[in-house]
Amino acid sequence: MLRAILALLFAILYLIIGIPVLFVEWIIGKFNRQAADISQLRMVQWAFRVILFICGTRLTIIGEENVPKDQPVLYIGNHRSYFDIIITYSRCPRLTGYVAKDSMKKVPLLSVWMTRLHCLFINRSDVKEALKTILAGIDNIKNGISMCIFPEGTRNKTEDLMLPFKEGSFKMAEKTGCLIVPMAISGSADILEAHFPKVKPVHVIVEYGKPIDP
């Protein structure tokens, strides 16, 4: 339980202390948007690595050499834990936005950070709004920003390896021609979800497959 409390406290403090940092980055972005974006990417990656350290999470990364570093891609992965985002974002070699459920927009501070990091919010129950999100993701990729989507549309809480993919999950790659990088995450649910609210130190394996040309 102590690990969970420490990780939560660190995350909250980071979000609060980071407010003036966001303001400074916003000013920098007026003159050099890329420099501001890269700075925020590295800051958040550092914070996520600290959270993983506090939680005692040990990572084995397989196939990271398959991830292109010179072009935007669409990451596609299975989704069993909130920690999937923390784990995979900490490994991104370039700017990457995540597609999150629409309800995340209501979370104070976190939604501000997510928006600044090019994350998008999707409402799958509203076809028009969902299409707007996909189009925004296409624009991100065209502007050199990778995107990550969990095509199951929600965390998989079943015994099945994966849930059916939601419609439109691959549209961003189809419309931009960017490579698709498949990710397989194993063991992440054992950090928290398997025994909520306790956090336990576990071994998580992340495997990146070879890029797929749509």
Regions found by a protein language model. Give the residues of each.
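Soluble extracytoplasmic domains of inner/organellar membrane proteins
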Residues: 105, 122, 128-130, 136-146, ...
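Soluble, non-transmembrane catalytic domains of enzymes that act on hydrophobic metabolites at membranes
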Residues: 1, 59-62, 158, 177
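A transmembrane-helix-recognition feature enriched in membrane-embedded lipid enzymes
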Residues: 1-60, 112
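Residue-level preference for the first positions of well-ordered beta-strands
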Residues: 72-74, 146-150
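A cross-family acyltransferase "interaction/gating" segment
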Residues: 109-112, 145-148, 157-214
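Short gly/ser/thr-rich secondary-structure transition/capping motifs
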Residues: 54-62, 130-131, 188-190
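Catalytic core of membrane glycerolipid acyltransferases/transacylases, capturing the structured
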Residues: 22-41, 54, 69-127
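Glycine-rich helix-loop-beta junction characteristic of Rossmann-like nucleotide cofactor-binding loops
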Residues: 64-68
